[in-house]
């Protein structure tokens, strides 16, 4: 029986990237029924409202087993709706954003090979959306940190290390300044860590870690780096720069019984319709979706085929040093994946 998955095509280059991903998923005969859901900045520009996600789309998202989301644009400025991703994370209680970051054979490695995983608490912190304008000259934002989400994201990090056979985790804080919120977070981490005696955990202040990951990134290979929402949003983006292109970085958001899969990059509206951008991240997000739905062989075929196409370098996009179009790279991955099953 086919799985039901909510599909958000997104803004800018999102629809093209999703089309390329669907082509690859069809090539491996993925047993998925996609339910298309309107959402994003372009939809909001046309229809207005207080949310980037209309009510009908919410119903489909809630009734699906999972969600595959293309990149979306979030409007800036006071009074505009919150992002699609943050809204779904909070609404579906997707407390852990996981971003694997690994260099690919055949690509530039600015500071050598890297292979680690970033885990980010995805529902609270400074992204809770609790902000107030007190006057024309004063605005405040609340950093909400609570025990249960902190324990859940710590458990996710330790479980991810355990699953991969890794022995190290690094918790990112600024506890010397944020003495209450980060103290609570680290207390939750230590509580959970008692259940993982074979995995070490080391606390790093965010400013020091941001420097150390550039000075010696290999020191953190085969480890899981985790922390609160804003800190890990910034750190995971920094670490992603150690890979040839942000177009290769994919991610997933997990709750207890739901998950959303997406590329880690933005919608790149200036490239909309040009068939130009790198489809790797969206395709690998689609592969991870299949793994989540227990179609592991098909997922593995896509992962290996994507790595092979990138390593060959003949059908890759401009950011990887090639001349292929988005659709041509997706075609190459799809053709190889269908043969690898």
Please give the residue ranges for each predicted region.
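N-terminal glycine-rich phosphate/adenylate-binding segment common to multiple enzyme folds
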Residues: 44-140, 230-234
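Glycine-rich phosphate/diphosphate-binding loop of Rossmann-like nucleotide-binding domains
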Residues: 6-27, 135-208
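N-terminal small/polar loop signature for handling phosphorylated ligands or for N-terminal nucleophile
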Residues: 39-59, 186-222, 227
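Buried hydrophobic packing segments
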Residues: 21, 25, 189, 282-290, ...
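Glycine-rich phosphate/nucleotide-binding loop
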Residues: 43-46, 55, 212-314
